[in-house]
Every structure is written in C-alpha cells, then in structure tokens.
Design a protein with these regions (language model features):
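Transmembrane beta-barrel wall of Gram-negative outer-membrane proteins
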Residues: 1-17, 22-58, 101-108
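Short, surface-exposed, polar/charged, turn-prone segments marking secondary-structure boundaries
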Residues: 7-9, 13, 37-41, 66, ...
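Flexible, solvent-exposed coil segments and beta strand-coil junctions
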Residues: 8-17, 70-84, 154-166
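Short, well-ordered helical secondary-structure segments
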Residues: 13, 27, 33, 84-88, ...
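Flexible loop and strand-edge segments within Gram-negative outer membrane beta-barrel domains
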Residues: 18, 22-23, 39, 43-97, ...
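Flexible, surface-exposed loop regions and adjacent strand-edge segments
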Residues: 27-32, 62-74, 130-140, 203
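Face-selective signature of the C-terminal outer-membrane beta-barrel domain
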Residues: 94-203
Length: 203
C-alpha cells in the first residue's frame, strides 16, 4: 500500500521448471514484476513498472501415428546425446521485458492528463535442423556420429552451413526494440459533454 511519504511498491518473482510429458521436452522460466509508485501531491501521481517472463522449452515436432505406435506416445526424435550431454535440435526461447513510466496529472476538478512512456526490448526464437541426421538404433539423434562425420568434411559450401551432407543446428531469431509514448487529455465541458484528445507515438 501507499506510505505516508507517498511511495508505494509491489513486486512478484516466480520460477518454474519441468520435464514435460514427452521425452526431451524440458523447460524452465521465470516471471518478474516490479511497480514503484509515487504520489507527489493531489495533482501529480507517478508510477514505474517493469515486467518480463524469460523462458525456454524444448519441443516435440509432429510424427506419424505409425511412429507413435512403434515407439510409444512419449517418443521424441528431436533430441539425443553427445557423450552424456543432452542436446536438442528444437528449443524455443524468448525474453521480452516491458518498461512503463506513467504520469497522471489532475489539472483541475474537470481536466486531467494521462501520459505513458514505454519501452520493450526483446529477443528470442527457435532452433531447428539443417542437413542430414544420423540416428541411433532406438531412433534418437546420434550427435557423436554427427560430430565425427562433420569433422571428416571440408566445411565448405552447403546450405545453412550443412556442408557435404553434414548436419547443423540453426537458430531463427526475432530481435526488436519498441519505444513509444501515449498521452490523453480529457476535460468536462458540461454535465453531458466532455472533450477528449490524445496521441500515440511509437518507433
């Protein structure tokens, strides 16, 4: 709640993680929220807000019913091991925090101005495969064999770096920076009529 000096604070922090229903569908993430408010006087009220939810989770792409009948419902052919290290070719990851600075200005009993300055910076995406997989007998990706094969190639040419029949894990990225300002002025002209005008600026 608001203290006698006009300041108020609210915050939240959570964490989750799990291994999913299907094999090779691990994931984890956090959620955070911070709000700082300051009521300068009866006319001016400020609030700063920051929130975000970084996360990553591994995926299980579509397969035929025949494959599930053969391998089981939890079968996932998008992961494997390099030595004893778990690796996946299908991972989604993202973090897009949002920052707001709000200013509420009570001009008089009939007029008010509300302004929000905001920013959102984020990046994320998903991984996938390019090239020829090598699989183990039980249907998982054989990263040891892939590593050995890739070493035997010259590394020249090939689409997306998968040269001479080799294999790579690629990442499709989405990166952006949003900045903007939203402001709204409202005044009461009479008991039955009000005037409202605003602006929405963004980059």
């Amino acid at each position: 709640g608001e203290k006698d000096n006009g300041w108020s604070t609210s915050m939240l922090l959570t964490h989750w993680q799990g291994d999913g229903y299907a094999d090779g569908t691990f994931g984890q993430g956090q959620t955070y929220f911070l709000s700082l408010g300051y009521k300068m006087n009866d006319k001016h009220n400020f609030n700063f807000l920051m929130t975000g939810a970084p996360q990553w989770h591994d995926q299980n792409f579509t397969k035929s019913i025949a494959t599930y009948l053969e391998r089981g419902r939890k079968y996932n052919n998008n992961y494997g091991y390099y030595g004893d290290q778990y690796l996946t070719e299908r991972r989604n990851f993202y973090h897009k925090p949002v920052f707001n600075l709000n200013w509420d200005f009570t001009i008089d009993e009939k007029s008010s101005l509300s302004t929000v300055l905001y920013a959102s910076t984020g990046n994320g995406g998903g991984t996938g495969n390019r090239g020829n997989r090598i699989r183990t007998e039980d249907g998982y990706i054989d990263y040891d064999a892939i590593y050995a094969y890739n070493l035997s190639t010259s590394g020249a040419g090939g689409a997306y770096g998968a040269a001479e029949g080799g294999y790579v894990t690629r990442s499709s990225m989405n990166m952006h920076n949003w900045f903007g300002l939203v402001t709204n002025y409202e005044t009461e002209l009479s008991d039955n009529l009000s005037f409202n005008v605003g602006a929405d600026l963004r980059t």
